[in-house]
Amino acid sequence: MGGFFGTVSKTACVADLFYGTDYNSHMGTKRAGMVTYAEGMGFMRSIHNLESSYFRTKFESELSKFKGNSGLGIISDTDPQPILINSHLGKFAIVTVAKVNNIPELEQDLLASNMHFSEMSLSKTNQTELIALLVIQGKDFVDGIENVFRKIKALARCSS
């Protein structure tokens, strides 16, 4: 399982991001990550293993290094996230909480299209990177996200 939290604000968002992501800590115990974006500075990212400690313990001392008005936080039981991508669409950060059921098929299609995978987890394709590669196949972000929905076969699940 896992959970993510995102925020875009007119003011600094780091505290909201930290507490919003921490709120999802019960959703997973393997890894956590945060990324913020500040105009003129770019992305600031940190990823930690949570198997021996809590989210707050790992990230609280780093909060001063994060700047910006937008950010993503993730609690993941699968891949280290967030990942940063630089593509023809521009630079972006991405997180996922998903169960992609057709990774081998998508992996073959992307490799046949001269794409590559650089984020491997336990010798398996990182599903977040796979989804990012599907996004960047689009002419813009909207087209790329629609491409993800067209190609991925996944288990849809909602929780409250």
Please place each PLM-identified region on the residue numbering.
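Conserved short alpha-helical segments that host acidic/polar catalytic motifs at enzyme active sites
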Residues: 1-160
